Amino acid sequence: MSKSENLYSAARELIPGGVNSPVRAFTGVGGTPLFIEKADGAYLYDVDGKAYIDYVGSWGPMVLGHNHPAIRNAVIEAAERGLSFGAPTEMEVKMAELVTNLVPTMDMVRMVNSGTEATMSAIRLARGFTGRDKIIKFEGCYHGHADCLLVKAGSGALTLGQPNSPGVPADFAKHTLTCTYNDLTSVHAAFEQYPQEIACIIVEPVAGNMNCVPPLPEFLPGLRALCDEFGALLIIDEVMTGFRVALAGAQDYYGVVPDLTCLGKIIGGGMPVGAFGGRRDVMDALAPTGPVYQAGTLSGNPIAMAAGFACLNEVAQPGIHETLDELTTRLAEGLLEAAEDANIPLVVNHVGGMFGIFFTDAESVTCYQDVMACDVERFKRFFHLMLEEGVYLAPSAFEAGFMSVAHSEEDINNTIDAARRVFAKL
């Protein structure tokens, strides 16, 4: 047995499923998950000593590559002054100033510890601010594991075939209205049915939890218009897209102005950080200035703030996002060319530093139904053959891939060459 197999066997006796987040268990592709020893740049190294070109990037945060010296040094320096104080620090102020400068729609920001905390808190705030209970989310979109959001969710929920999680009371779920991503008609119908009851829409500007599905041109502006018409708030969940699709996020890339924004992943540089923020009048409704309660023992802790501050300063450097886009486009075009040469039907969606691989005869993939029609069994074979080639993709047909600026042209070319060999076996 390999070291990964031995560790997985031991882990399953101690941890549910052997992992601390379900998709890591390779449930969506089968086999034994890799146990990682270390990572550097664009590469992961497993406990058996094998190196992999990594397109998971810790599920998004590692936009600069693994073990970036600026982030590592910031964490070490902060740790020498103490790990957590439970009191305000200067770095929290500097971090808030940086975030609100980079994302102009955020007048104010509140730091939390995860993307789930960010979305959960933003929805509570929207409900408190509007005095309404119902929310709109989209089929196949994932916004963390809060009860009200585990309704027809994407990400690991799709991987496990459980779009509705047991343990969520029907009385909670009844306030969550699920519409079809990229379909404004379904959203308008929900507002027509509940014109005075919907507090907010929460949406991934690029759906990254049913693989990678960008918005159609009219979709996000249409959501903004419907929120304005019916007095609801628009929450854009940029946990995945923030600082990746563009410096100011997908909202800037697509030209839509939300009322609230949720952030995660890159904002922590690899440490557990989330944030939500937006209009000043809405944010003022948060405790202690307002009646909507939200708190966290480790929110804004000095280690996480130091990591995030260092990461965002690096991400804000000129040329970062142009490089991400160029590398991702090169990979997408190379995969499509290799698949065509092998007569493999393939769609590759990509935007900024995100991409999605779909085995499908369809010309495009734009919604949940398109995603579910793709050939998952072929993806499973593709995943394992690429893994044998030393390329680590997300172990699920329903998860996006992530590029970093640490990936080189050689890495991209080697990945495309590996895909050519794999397509010949499919």
Curated annotation (Swiss-Prot):
It is an enzyme of class 5 (isomerase). It catalyses: (S)-4-amino-5-oxopentanoate = 5-aminolevulinate. GO terms for biological process: protoporphyrinogen IX biosynthetic process. Its EC number is 5.4.3.8. Its cofactor is pyridoxal 5'-phosphate. Pathway: Porphyrin-containing compound metabolism; protoporphyrin-IX biosynthesis; 5-aminolevulinate from L-glutamyl-tRNA(Glu): step 2/2. GO terms for molecular function: glutamate-1-semialdehyde 2,1-aminomutase activity; pyridoxal phosphate binding; transaminase activity. Keywords: Cytoplasm, Isomerase, Porphyrin biosynthesis, Pyridoxal phosphate. It is found in: Cytoplasm. Pfam families: Aminotran_3. GO terms for cellular component: cytoplasm. PROSITE patterns: AA_TRANSFER_CLASS_3 (PS00600). The modification N6-(pyridoxal phosphate)lysine is found at K265. Belongs to the class-III pyridoxal-phosphate-dependent aminotransferase family. HemL subfamily. HAMAP family: HemL_aminotrans_3. Homodimer. This is Glutamate-1-semialdehyde 2,1-aminomutase. The gene is hemL.
